[in-house]
Amino acid sequence: MSDAPELTVLIPFHNEAGNVIPVLEEVHDALGEITFEVICVNDASHDATEAELVEATARWPDTVRVFNHVERRGKSAALITGLRAARGEWVQLLDGDGQNDPHDTARLWPSFTGANADPRLGLIAGRRNSRNDGGFKWLQSRLANGIRRFALKDDVTDSGCGFKIMRTEAFRELPYFASMHRFFPALIKRAGWKVREELVNDRPRLAGKSKYGFLGRLGAGMVDLFGMMWLVRRGRPGIAREWDDPRA
């Protein structure tokens, strides 16, 4: 891994035993035409996730890198850990449960890296083409997305989709706070970059169960939304651009 890759695939894992190897197999199968690295962040799992990640580094020593949190810090902290180590110009965020499809990355890649790509594009946000959730979960997601979109004007309709591709430069400009991963589109817009939404595939998780319950998601989400509204509307810093900055 001496040369910098074009893409860093960043995957947080917490208690995803049974998912690690299948997810990484699919990443390697889908992205064969792109130079990439995979950064896996183990957020203090207490199942066989760590052992499977050790197996992965032995199987793909040229592409897979693993970072272990000593104690659980949450998804946003895991993403920041991976970001600090990312070497690609773009960072692909995938969930560790296999619901996101890396073949969508291969399909979209020419549209944001080719000769006619928009230099001001900071984020491609996935919008799930066919949700694999039950009726109640689908309803709460629609409601939450509508409230968030009205409050933040972030140009996306499905912020809960874990599939996101970000320009690494833009990612590194974002302020860190717990649960920031819920608001990447709004944060990217706040920093002066463009956001684009694309339809992506959605599948049932491969193994295990979701880590998020309805009440916990609702309570934390509302508190974070109020804080994010303040940040977007009152906390925007003065932004200086060099002459060749694409956002100038």
Positions of predicted regions on the chain:
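Structured catalytic core of nucleotide-sugar glycosyltransferases
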Residues: M1-D133, E169, E173, A186-R190, ...
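Hydrophobic helical membrane-anchoring modules
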Residues: M1-E6, G146, K153, F177-A248
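Juxtamembrane loop-helix boundary motifs flanking transmembrane segments in multi-pass membrane proteins
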Residues: N19, G135, L139, F214-R217
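A recurrent flexible, glycine/aromatic-enriched loop bordering the glycosyltransferase active site
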Residues: R128-W138, R148-F163, H181, R190
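Active-site Tyr-X1-5-Lys
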Residues: L143
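Conserved nucleotide-sugar donor-binding
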Residues: R87-E89, G146, F150, G160-L174
